[in-house]
């Protein structure tokens, strides 16, 4: 008699994806972040659903509805902070997941990689719109500054901005549509994640060596389900520690003041996970140039597979590429720090140098290092 999980049409799909899935036996903890992202998405959808039950997307009541959630709703403060810090957790896992893909050469699965870039863009759009919803000072001014960047697009820029705003400034119409998109996008992200998994299971997972591991694979369950369960436990511990001990650690104090179009904060900045891109945007004096650099800072990931010219897939045996990779990580951390600083000397020049290095390492230095490593292997 065939087991029901191998026979039932629906169970068969789940079985082939999470139970009997042939998995390389040597994948490390860096491969856990994909499942962490799934858990983060589930947390965000659930907490977001409960928040949406009490939130009102109207400029006059949005701020007070968030206050009401925290003060009057049963465990509303916990749901709100789980959602806000869950977004930070989401981005930590997302950056580590992309970083692992770059280090171990997972970008050679082009379809999976491109869907991943789409997912990254969708998550960033969702997080940006979510930041606007509490209608605090930084919500309002962040929305004004970031949406206003679209006016740099030639010919249609100004019309496009007014179309997105639904008027001549960020107001009620903007907040309502941002709430609608913020609600629907996580479900689109969930659908994209399924497509991401579909393409991944077509090729099979990569492994730290970057070598084909078809001859040495083990079932996903129980080996990796237990490993993921431990990861979920540690992730939950970290998230709950953040929520229960320092819920406002990653937020902005300005967002505890209601939005006031007549009072500009001294330093407008987005959430910490956008600061690297914001620093790249600010490092270019020209508005259009800054917007192009901002978009390219994410879309540059799409051309990484075409710049790969190394004989070895993974960086595990490529010391020169490893040095450049960690220089890139250091550059991104520097950009994140600079994005949170005021626009003055010496932060301007540090941001410009870090931005140049970011593009230089990915576009020129890494392919050159790979070429040199290929030559050294033959030497």
Swiss-Prot record:
Binding, a ubiquinone: 201
Listed InterPro entries: Cyt_b/b6_C, Cyt_b/b6_C_sf, Cyt_b/b6_N, Cytb/b6-like_sf, Cytochrome_b, Cytochrome_b_C_euk/bac, Cytochrome_b_N_euk/bac, Di-haem_cyt_TM
GO cellular component, one term: respiratory chain complex III
UniProt record, GO biological process: mitochondrial electron transport, ubiquinol to cytochrome c
Cofactor note: Binds 2 heme b groups non-covalently.
CC cofactor: heme b
Keyword annotations from UniProtKB, A to Z: Electron transport, Heme, Iron, Membrane, Metal-binding, Mitochondrion, Mitochondrion inner membrane, Respiratory chain, Transmembrane, Transmembrane helix, Transport, Ubiquinone
Pfam families: Cytochrom_B_C, Cytochrome_B
Binding-site positions, heme b b562: 83, 182
A Gene Ontology molecular function term of the record: ubiquinol-cytochrome-c reductase activity
Topology with respect to the bilayer: Multi-pass membrane protein
Predominant localisation class: mitochondrion
Residues noted as binding heme b b566 in the record, renumbered to the chain: 97, 196
Plastid is among the record's keywords: no
Residue ranges crossing the lipid bilayer per the database entry: 33-53, 77-98, 113-133, 178-198, 226-246, 288-308, 320-340, 347-367
Annotated compartments: Mitochondrion inner membrane
Family note: Belongs to the cytochrome b family.
Subunit: The cytochrome bc1 complex contains 11 subunits: 3 respiratory subunits (MT-CYB, CYC1 and UQCRFS1), 2 core proteins (UQCRC1 and UQCRC2) and 6 low-molecular weight proteins (UQCRH/QCR6, UQCRB/QCR7, UQCRQ/QCR8, UQCR10/QCR9, UQCR11/QCR10 and a cleavage product of UQCRFS1). This cytochrome bc1 complex then forms a dimer.
Biological function: Component of the ubiquinol-cytochrome c reductase complex (complex III or cytochrome b-c1 complex) that is part of the mitochondrial respiratory chain. The b-c1 complex mediates electron transfer from ubiquinol to cytochrome c. Contributes to the generation of a proton gradient across the mitochondrial membrane that is then used for ATP synthesis.
Other remarks on this protein: Heme 1 (or BL or b562) is low-potential and absorbs at about 562 nm, and heme 2 (or BH or b566) is high-potential and absorbs at about 566 nm.
Name assigned to this protein: Cytochrome b
Organism: Napaeozapus insignis
